[in-house]
């Protein structure tokens, strides 16, 4: 079967899928996302949303849409941070797009008591029409990829099959994909033999762009990946905060792959929407004032609290193996009439 089919079965099968049957987030799960590292992340995303709403002309009604909200931590912190803007809170209706019953239940627990209407949806297309501010943190990396490998007679699809011993293995389709070179960026066409190229279906990004064009507004997408299309296998599996073989324990471990921000931007712009970035996550959070927010939180805290805030700050904006600041990137999408979204000025 294609790699994309394998990923979709492992992650989203209604009875056995990884995301549909469990809560994988947090210290007790398999991985930790930026909102789980510190409240500062969600608070700053909330301020970005409020500033974007003002830039939109402060409409009386606005849909606040999150794709793949996890446990609801980011949205909870974001809405708490914008309590100082009652007009924005009064205008907002929150729409959470998530197919996982387990995570929806967790989101309900996290967000209960907030004085904001909240609705759940299976897809972005299900969200009612109107001006929207869309946020997606570590959403696109979990969308299924296809893989091809270059050989002397062209590009061949990489697939997954069952070996004689019953184990899953990668295989290569015998026939090359006809005229596949014509679809690739120049730097990919020039790749060496045995190079692996990955790509995703562009329909989820196109849905975001269409929504912005139809109803007005903006979107903020944060994920890990590379700025330009490139070769190299990035499919990875994570379980219990450690890397694993993606072909073992299907449905029991997380499968992701790097986001190709060049391809993502092209898909978004194909709808007429305008994109900004990508910029590093560290740059986004610095421009939104994370260092000032950290200092404020530390001002009245204990030594232990200050140390924890410093550690979280280093994780969110630091570089290298322990930091998320350079691997994670942000891209903004807006209606052409909106202008440059907050934090994305050159």
Predicted regions and their residues:
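Rossmann-like AdoMet
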Residues: 1-67, 71-131, 283, 289-292, ...
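Alpha/beta-hydrolase-fold catalytic nucleophile elbow
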Residues: 97, 137, 222
